[in-house]
């Protein structure tokens, strides 16, 4: 059976929105990382390199910064 093609999602716009919201609230990556149990480098990769976070981390970041996923659809 042939595999169904999987659509790759470009996460860059989400990462940029997270970075804008985080810096707008004057929060450092270290602060956010400590509070969310993430490394600052991982957060930087999400913000700058479009790394796909786990669904749980994605959900927590969207809630933390009140970002609507609908704006990217």
Show which residues each predicted segment covers:
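Key DNA-contact positions within bacterial/archaeal DNA-binding proteins
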Residues: 30, 41, 70
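DNA major-groove recognition helix of helix-turn-helix/homeodomain DNA-binding modules
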Residues: 56-71
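Short basic helix-loop element that most often maps to the first helix and adjoining turn
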Residues: 16-35, 60
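Recognition helix of helix-turn-helix/homeodomain-like DNA-binding domains
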Residues: 37-52
């Amino acid at each position: 059976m042939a595999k169904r093609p999987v659509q790759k999602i470009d996460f860059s716009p989400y990462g940029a929105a997270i970075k804008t919201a985080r810096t707008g609230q004057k929060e450092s990556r270290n602060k956010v990382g400590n509070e969310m149990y993430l490394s600052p480098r991982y957060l930087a990769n999400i913000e700058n390199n479009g790394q796909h976070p786990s669904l749980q981390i994605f959900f927590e970041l969207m809630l933390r910064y009140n970002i609507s996923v609908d704006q990217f659809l």
